[in-house]
Curated annotation (Swiss-Prot):
Pathway: Amino-acid biosynthesis; L-methionine biosynthesis via salvage pathway; L-methionine from S-methyl-5-thio-alpha-D-ribose 1-phosphate: step 5/6
Name of the protein in question: Acireductone dioxygenase
Reactions listed under catalytic activity: 1,2-dihydroxy-5-(methylsulfanyl)pent-1-en-3-one + O2 = 4-methylsulfanyl-2-oxobutanoate + formate + 2 H(+); 1,2-dihydroxy-5-(methylsulfanyl)pent-1-en-3-one + O2 = 3-(methylsulfanyl)propanoate + CO + formate + 2 H(+)
One Pfam family from the record: ARD
Length: 179
């Protein structure tokens, strides 16, 4: 099962867990109030998984590809890692399914505090359009993930501040409704 927690304020190596002290775990229900959705799937059978197909159909995830993030295979690795870790939002949902390896998604809560979500093999997450977030590998420095999209893939990050976008305005309205 996925683990999530409030982060400390350290700016040291982002690949470390950065748990706040004392530990402040975050439940799946708390993540749902932020619009974050989570599924646990069998990554060994992702090519023929009826559960994944059901989710894709239900949420209209019609396009997918697979990305491997590691120093040996990803062109412009250092540049990409920095870009992924820059706080940003998207105008569409961000959907990732971890097939191998691990990493962290960090999302902002309603008080603008960072929550770290530890993602491992079999974890699938949907971040809502308009949520500020970032991604980093953990200390294993490797992840293979399926990227899913509704329609044609659009992966345009808008770095913070990006509060003027409709997706952000709608997301903030959603948060007010979950208070």
């Amino acid at each position: 099962m996925v683990q999530a927690w409030y982060m400390d304020e350290s700016t040291a190596d982002p690949r470390k867990p950065h748990r706040a002290q004392p530990d402040r775990p975050v439940s799946l229900e708390q993540l749902r109030t932020l619009g974050v959705l989570y599924w646990k799937l069998d990554a060994d059978k992702y090519e023929n998984d009826p559960e994944l197909e059901k989710i894709r159909k239900m949420r209209n995830y019609s396009w997918m590809d697979i990305i491997t993030i590691c120093k040996d295979t990803l062109p412009n690795y250092e540049e990409k890692i920095k870009m992924f870790f820059e706080e940003h939002l998207h105008l569409d949902e961000e959907i990732r399914y971890i097939l191998e390896g691990s990493g962290y998604f960090d999302v902002r809560d309603k008080e603008d505090k960072w929550i770290r979500i530890s993602m491992e093999k079999g974890d699938m997450i949907t971040l809502p359009a308009g949520i500020y977030h970032r991604f980093t590998l953990d200390e294993k420095n490797y992840v293979k993930a399926m990227r899913l999209f509704v329609g044609e893939p659009v992966w345009t990050p808008y770095n913070r501040p990006a509060d003027h976008f409709d997706a952000r305005v709608q997301y903030m309205s959603f948060l007010e409704g979950t208070a």
